[in-house]
Regions:
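Transmembrane beta-barrel domains of outer membrane proteins
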Residues: 62-64, 119-123, 154-156, 183-185
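Surface-exposed strand-loop-strand hairpins of Gram-negative outer-membrane beta-barrel proteins
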Residues: 35-60
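Membrane-embedded beta-strand positions of outer-membrane beta-barrel proteins
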Residues: 28-32, 75-77, 116-120, 131, ...
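Residues that define the transmembrane beta-barrel architecture of outer-membrane proteins
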Residues: 24-26, 53-59, 110-114, 145-149, ...
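Flexible, solvent-exposed loop segments that connect beta-strands
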Residues: 41-50, 84-108
């Protein structure tokens, strides 16, 4: 096909660029996220919804091996602070009514967790779908010492900057928290 202003040399250079072979490489994603959440728990066969909202903040560092233009996988170091974690173990009043729940603030070590997860990612031109499964290695209490699963969508906003929207489950069935954040990809190509 011929167009105005192009010659055969331009066509040959374009053909060479299209046929460049993909070379696998490692990229590094750093993600900072946060969200608000509600919390409920069961005690003596009765369900309680804790009044108010609680903050969740996290940081992920994920080296990813890029197997092809469309798939990458790696391990992620995941740190998360959850203000509502393990509250059921720190009830201040005896046999409270649902609107009168009072709590002692749990120690930081019961609300903070660090884990490692295996991640895989399907890469598309504008966004990527990220799936992961992991285990908290540092964390005390039922809410922070568990297996967790991550499903996230990464939408590119610049060459190496992306928005991160995800959800985390724990113990393969229980909803944990929303993950709204921003990320940066080092060594992205």
């Amino acid at each position: 096909m011929r167009t105005f202003g192009r010659d055969a040399a331009d066509d040959r250079r374009a053909a060479v660029r299209r046929s460049d072979p993909f070379r696998p490489y490692v990229s590094y994603d750093v993600i900072l996220y946060g969200a608000l959440r509600k919390k409920g728990f069961l005690q003596e066969s009765r369900a309680y919804l804790i009044p108010g909202s609680f903050a969740v903040a996290g940081l992920n560092f994920t080296p990813m091996y890029n197997f092809s233009r469309f798939f990458r996988a790696g391990l992620s170091l995941d740190a998360q602070y959850d203000e509502s974690a393990n509250l059921k173990d720190h009830i201040a009043n005896d046999y409270p009514l649902a609107d009168e729940l009072k709590f002692h603030r749990p120690p930081f070590k019961e609300q903070f967790a660090v884990g490692v997860s295996i991640r895989c990612e399907v890469v598309m031109p504008i966004f990527s779908i990220n799936l992961g499964i992991g285990k908290n290695l540092i964390g005390r209490g039922d809410d922070t010492n568990s297996f967790y699963q991550v499903f996230a969508l990464k939408a590119d906003v610049a060459r190496n900057v992306f928005l991160h929207v995800g959800y985390q489950l724990y113990k393969f069935r229980n909803p944990n928290n929303l993950m709204l954040g921003v990320g940066y990809r080092f060594n992205g190509r």
